[in-house]
Structures are given as structure tokens and as C-alpha cells.
Amino acid sequence: MATKTLKVTQTKSSIGRLPKHRATLTGLGLRRINHTVEVEDTPSVRGMINKVYYMVSVEELG
């Protein structure tokens, strides 16, 4: 069974943001603006994305 993945792209800078939000971006594997990573679609990852929703864009992959 194929697992669902999400394509997460950082769209805004982390400079001047809350330290916990910066740590969340690091936890997602994002380093800079326009950096894109593919992550597994799990509740914990969804929670991380919801925390920094204003700095990332998300696409669902099959």
C-alpha cells in the first residue's frame, strides 16, 4: 500500500519569527525560501504544517 505524501514549500522567511516556529520549519526539513521537501502524511506532520501555515504552501501527492 502506497503511503500518501505531501509536498511542502517554504514561501516566507523565518527571520523574526517565534523560535518554536523556526524549529518547526527545521523539523519539516525546510532551510530557505522556495525550498521544497516531500514528507509523509501523518497527524504529527499535519500539526507541524498547521503551526506554520503562514510560511508554507502544501500540495498533496498520490
Swiss-Prot record:
The keyword Protein biosynthesis does not apply. Belongs to the universal ribosomal protein uL30 family. This is Large ribosomal subunit protein uL30. Coiled coil: none annotated. Keywords: Ribonucleoprotein, Ribosomal protein. The keyword Protein biosynthesis does not apply. Part of the 50S ribosomal subunit. One of its GO terms (biological process) is translation. It comes from the Bacteria. One of its GO terms (molecular function) is structural constituent of ribosome. One of its GO terms (cellular component) is cytosolic large ribosomal subunit. InterPro entries: Ribo_uL30_ferredoxin-like_sf (IPR036919), Ribosomal_uL30_bac-type (IPR005996), Ribosomal_uL30_CS (IPR018038), Ribosomal_uL30_ferredoxin-like (IPR016082).
